[in-house]
């Protein structure tokens, strides 16, 4: 069962899982997913969620900010990372609905060439620099390109350090 797999991952010292509804055939706020999220929280597993549009199903979004807000209303104690700064082409909605959520982080995966430096700065400041994690989504984005995007923002050196490594250290308990 999925619960046995989660327990095995936790026993092995894994830090989390990634879920991608487009490829795993679920919507983030489906009732059948709630016990899975809860068990991840109990086991201390971080849940990374693909969010927003995916090229495999561009007209059928499986995770967005509204769905994640409904999930957060039903579960507590689960650490979520909502990928792609809140969702591919859904970042502004995520900023409105998820900024300030206690157990939610955002990552920079697949942002290079898609989000301007000004918009990235605005999103980081809305979420809080302590809630953003460096990620590339390689091979879709080269880590160097994401790094160049972050470097081209008006974020402070301290905010950039948080994004590049301090936040991950804190989230992962390193």
Predicted regions and their residues:
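Flexible loop residues that form catalytic
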Residues: 22, 52, 86, 109, ...
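Histidine/acidic-residue-rich catalytic or RNA/ligand-binding cores of hydrolases
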Residues: 59-67, 90-99, 116-125, 140-152
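Acidic (Asp/Glu)-rich catalytic clusters
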Residues: 4-14, 34-43, 70-75, 94-101, ...
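Domain-core and long-helix interface of multi-subunit machines
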Residues: 85-88, 99-103, 109-114
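Active-site gating/metal-coordination segments in enzymes
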Residues: 1-55, 59, 114
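Conserved, mostly hydrophobic/aromatic
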Residues: 9, 17, 40, 84, ...
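Hydrophobic faces of well-ordered beta-strands that scaffold small-molecule active sites
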Residues: 15-19, 47-49, 80-83, 104-108, ...
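Mid-to-C-terminal alpha-helical segments outside catalytic/metal-binding sites
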Residues: 126-133, 141-174
